[in-house]
Amino acid sequence: GIAHAAIAAHLMGLPMGYVRSGAKDHGRQNRIEGRLREGEKVVVIEDLISTGGSLIETVEALREAGAEVLGAVSIFTYGMEKGKKRLAEAGVRAVSLTDFDEIVAVAEAEGYIPAQSVPGLMAFRADPSDESWMGGRK
């Protein structure tokens, strides 16, 4: 998401920063890079949302630093119920440019995947940890 955020910030003439998954072990040991002022309004840009875990961690770090997180934008989301629920519980509003269902529908319509693959793909989206979607393959 950093490259996408940098481009968006540049095109809109806005400042840009990013949140590390953990603080650096050298230098100033910052977790948040870039200028962030108390009460500053922030939109998080992600490349992908699946379970929502990394997005929620990012939002929590920004909130702890005093930012007002308006929401998040992602390029793609799997649209997993677990992720939707977690984001709602954390009070994170997220919108995505496209999602798993749309990509599967277009891929099927354009002949990139056969129709018989669609149920397995939807089973994956519903529960990736249930390997039955693999049709017996591992």
Where are these regions (language model features)?
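PRPP-dependent phosphoribosyltransferase catalytic core
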Residues: 60-138
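Short, glycine/charge-rich flexible loops or terminal/linker lids adjacent to PRPP-binding catalytic cores
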Residues: 2-43, 51-57
